[in-house]
Amino acid sequence: MKRLKNELNALVNRGVDRHLRLAVTGLSRSGKTAFITAMVNQLLNIHAGARLPLLSAVREECLLGVKRIPQRDFGIPRFTYDEGLAQLYGDPPAWPTPTRGVSEIRLALRFKSNDSLLRHFKDTSTLYLEIVDYPGEWLLDLPMLAQDYLSWSRQMTGLLNGQRGEWSVKWRMMCEGLDPLAPADENRLADIAAAWTDYLHHCKQQGLHFIQPGRFVLPGDMAGAPALQFSPWPDVDAWGESKLAQADKHTNAGMLRERFNYYCEKVVKGFYKNHFLRFDRQIVLVDCLQPLNSGPQAFNDMRLALTQLMQSFHYGQRTLFRRLFSPVIDKLLFAATKADHVTIDQHANMVSLLQQLIQDAWQNAAFEGISMDCLGLASVQATTSGIIDVNGEKIPALRGNRLSDGAPLTVYPGEVPARLPGQAFWDKQGFQFEAFRPQVMDVDKPLPHIRLDAALEFLIGDKLR
């Protein structure tokens, strides 16, 4: 009888144990590394003070334990959890160093199943959770697959106005006199590509998000490769699209076109085939506050980046993405990060603003049966909320330490617009976002957070039942 029970348990193990591959990405400076570090920290401390009341498996005491286990793919770098934790609990505390490529961490979550018929044979089940971190810049490259070199060039040069125009002056000057039909000058093309790369780095440093090609700012082991030595053609109309399209591969225009095509075929498709195709669920982190602080160009750039990014998640039956990759992602969560950097009364506005930014994608995802949600969170709570008296008026405020110098601050950042801001908002400029460093924390206690448990419930809650 005991042998029969053991054999039944082994059979049930194969049927009940589950694997879930969760992808975490976000626009630049959205806090991906802090999010993953905090999520893992909460799960590993479910019996040591973690605050996860919105995760039903914890609330109902069904989650029995969580431990780290070795990852299955030895070719992917390990996510730097311990290093990030040490920085957060450091003296002084600091935000984890951002990751610059794909990394992974794997957890085993042991739980009691409440609704499975198999519970009659087996008391517990295991969810193997693989958390994969990858740069949002790589996701922003996917729409390039629907473009040819000349249409992409038109789009890129069409953005070169305002500050982008100022930052790209060097690139434009280096392109002057470049004959598209002349024999390819590899050294000159490499120098022009380097100038384009410098421009992209400057855009990123200034808080802009729509960066293409994404690998140019995060090259990894591809640094210096010809695949990363191209740039848009500076003026398609001056030469005529038909003439440029006929340039053979040994000309300047032809070589740039060939490298663009190689980048799309090998680099962009390669990432999605090797990684994205295997994702089950996805969370996209968005910092809406810094663009509001920076002004209309930065905010509109974030909006453009999200629009481009959402093309990557366009699940329509006839889309390029569906034809190429047949994705299996069934849940998609958008999170407005740094909820601790605004007062509690503005949290609903943060979520409403993010919903406005991704409205079209939300409608499409619902049509395709994809479960999608938006929420606001703080992976690691860096401030405390309070009330201050200003000229006899009680107003909500935040207390924390400024990121730049650690100075203590008590501030009211202002109101977050609930809808896409119009000119009146920018004229008023009533929003002043401060960047805070992490607060000093007890190393024996889990990291403080805001609604991280709500994100966990959406992303993995149904797999723990």
Ranges and model annotations:
Residues 369-372, 384-404:
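Long, charge-rich C-terminal accessory regions
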Residues 362, 366, 370-378:
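Extended oligomerization regions of viral-like shell subunits
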Residues 39-44, 144-149, 299, 348-354, ...:
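Short secondary-structure boundary/capping segments
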Residues 7-11, 16, 42-328, 343, ...:
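Switch- and interface-adjacent substructures of P-loop NTPase systems
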Residues 335-342, 375-386:
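Short, conserved secondary-structure transition motifs
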